[in-house]
Swiss-Prot record:
Organism per entry: Mus musculus (Mouse)
InterPro entries to which the protein is assigned, alphabetical: GSG-1, PMP-22/EMP/MP20-like
Family: Belongs to the GSG1 family.
Membrane association type: Multi-pass membrane protein
Keywords: Cell membrane, Membrane, Phosphoprotein, Synapse, Transmembrane, Transmembrane helix
GO cellular component: asymmetric synapse; glutamatergic synapse; postsynaptic density membrane; Schaffer collateral - CA1 synapse
Modified residues (Phosphoserine): 274
Function: As a component of the inner core of AMPAR complexes, modifies AMPA receptor (AMPAR) gating.
Lineage start: Eukaryota, Metazoa, Chordata, Craniata, Vertebrata
Topology, Extracellular side: 30-122, 185-207
Side Cytoplasmic, residues: 1-8, 144-163, 229-322
Gene (name only): Gsg1l
Protein name (database record): Germ cell-specific gene 1-like protein
Length: 322
C-alpha cells in the first residue's frame, strides 16, 4: 500500500506543478487571442507615395496636366476605393496588454487591454484578474501540501490529513481558474464589438496562451481527482487491513442452548459438584467435536495455551462451566 500511495502522490504533484507552470505562463503572456485588424492605408499626406496620383510613371504624364485639386485643409487623400483602401495588420492580446504590429516597421505597439475594455466590462475584467491570481495562489498551496505529504509518507494518518487538504485546495483552484477564463473570454468578445474603432479586430481566434490556460485547468482537475482517488483508496485499504486484523483476533461466536444452561444450573444447585469437570470437558467436546477432543496426557491441538483459555471463556456461563 505504501508504494502505490507514494506513486499516486508523485503523479498528483507532477500534474499540479504542470498546471502551475501553464497558469503562470498564460497569465503573463499576451497571446490569449490573436488575429488581424483592418486599418486605412496611409494617404498622400502621410508619405504614401504609391497612393498618390503623381507617383511613379504618372508623374511625368501629369506634369503638363492641370494640377489636381488638393483636399481641403491639406488632409491626406487616396484614389483607391472599397477594400483597397485598407490593409490588415496582426495583433495579439492578453490579460494585461494588447499589441499591434507597426505598419512599415518591425516593431509592435502595445497598450493596456484594461483601457480598451468598455466601461461596463471593466469590473468583470478586474474580477477575472483577481480570480486568476487566486487560482495561481491556491495551486501553490496545493502543491506545497502535496510535497509535505511526500515527506510524511511514512505516517498514514498525517498523509491522509495532508492529502485531504491538498485535494480541497486543488479543487477550489480549478473552479476559480475556470471562472476566470470564462470571464476573460466574455470581456474580450464584448470588447470586439464595443471597443475602440481603431482596435476592433477584422478576424480573430484564440492563441496559445488561451490553450495553456485551459491546459492548466485540465491538469489542475486531474491532480485533484488523483489526490481524491489516493485519499479514498488509502482509506479503503486502511479500513480493509484493520478489518482483517480484527477478524484474526475475533472470538468465534458462542451458541449456548438455554435449556442446557438451565439443566447444568439445576445440577449444580443440587450439589452435584463432582461432575463440574465432566461438564467442562463435555462442553469442550460438544463445542469442537473433531479438533478439540480432550485426551488424557495430551496437549490441545493448534498449540494452545491461548486457545485453551479461549475455550474456557466460551464455556464459562453465569459463574459455572457450561
Amino acid at each position: 500500500m505504501k508504494t502505490s500511495r507514494r506513486g499516486r502522490a508523485l503523479l498528483a504533484v507532477a500534474l499540479n506543478l504542470l498546471a502551475l507552470l501553464f497558469a503562470t505562463t498564460a497569465f503573463l503572456t499576451t497571446y490569449w487571442c490573436q488575429g488581424t485588424q483592418r486599418v486605412p492605408k496611409p494617404g498622400c499626406g502621410q508619405g504614401g507615395g504609391a497612393n498618390c496620383p503623381n507617383s511613379g510613371a504618372n508623374a511625368t504624364a501629369n506634369s503638363t496636366a492641370a494640377p489636381v485639386a488638393a483636399s481641403p485643409a491639406g488632409a491626406p487623400y487616396s484614389w483607391e476605393a472599397g477594400d483597397e483602401r485598407f490593409q490588415l495588420r496582426r495583433f495579439h492580446t492578453g490579460i494585461w496588454y494588447s499589441c499591434e504590429e507597426e505598419l512599415g516597421g518591425p516593431g509592435e505597439k502595445c497598450r493596456s487591454f484594461i483601457d480598451l475594455a468598455p466601461a461596463s466590462e471593466k469590473g468583470v475584467l478586474w474580477l477575472s484578474v483577481v480570480s486568476e491570481v487566486l487560482y495561481i495562489l491556491l495551486l501553490v498551496v496545493g502543491f506545497s501540501l502535496m510535497c509535505l505529504e511526500l515527506v510524511h509518507s511514512s505516517s498514514v494518518i498525517d498523509g491522509l490529513k495532508l492529502n485531504a487538504f491538498a485535494a480541497v485546495f486543488t479543487v477550489l483552484s480549478g473552479l476559480l481558474g475556470m471562472v476566470a477564463h470564462m470571464m476573460y473570454t466574455q470581456v474580450f468578445q464584448v470588447t470586439v464589438s464595443l471597443g475602440p474603432e481603431d482596435w476592433r479586430p477584422h478576424s480573430w481566434d484564440y492563441g496559445w496562451s488561451f490553450c495553456l490556460a485551459w491546459g492548466s485547468f485540465t491538469c489542475c482537475m486531474a491532480a485533484s481527482v488523483t489526490t481524491l482517488n489516493s485519499y479514498t483508496k488509502t482509506v479503503i485499504e486502511f479500513r480493509h487491513k484493520r478489518k482483517v486484523f480484527e477478524q484474526g483476533y475475533r472470538e468465534e461466536p458462542t451458541f449456548i442452548d438455554p435449556e442446557a444452561i438451565k439443566y447444568f444450573r439445576e445440577r449444580i444447585e443440587k450439589g452435584d459438584v463432582s461432575e463440574e469437570e465432566d461438564f467442562r470437558l463435555a462442553c469442550r467436546h460438544e463445542r469442537y467435536p473433531t479438533r478439540h477432543q480432550p485426551h488424557m496426557g495430551d496437549s490441545w491441538p493448534r498449540s494452545s495455551a491461548h486457545e485453551a483459555a479461549e475455550l474456557n471463556r466460551q464455556c464459562w456461563v453465569l459463574g459455572h462451566w457450561v
